[in-house]
Amino acid sequence: MEDMAANGCLTVLLGVDDAGRVEAWVAERPGCVVFAAGEDEALRRIPAAAAEYDGWLARWGLARLWDIPAVARALRTADQTGVCILERVPVGESIVHGNTAAFFAWDQQPVTDDEIEATLRLLAASRRELLATLRRFQPDQLTLRPGGGARTVEQIAR
């Protein structure tokens, strides 16, 4: 088996709903996801999303966070360049940004201690960044309801 990343290929897992909306997960970058109106759009946006994710990890000193055996499950022979689809599954509910619904064969594998440790490190860095961002907000900004939602920024953060 060849490492698709070594071939310049990002492996993705696609969940597709009845309307054709897609959630596209980058297999070697747990938590890196693109939500799009269709598959072509999702696949076009994957390289930029992966680069942004990698930059974020590097800023927090976590560039090699996912260099663990469990994440190497994304390996297979590359038959595409750029973005390679590892798995495509139908999703029985509407896909909207932030609402993940796909369940992949990948998800059936038991979580390893290394994955749990890496995830906890990622969450700690995310929290630090969120708190640093919130400290720059003015008090009235904390009462905003993003996207016209039911909760304020402060309620979401708590």
Feature map (PLM): residue ranges:
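Aromatic-glycine hotspot motif
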Residues: 2-158
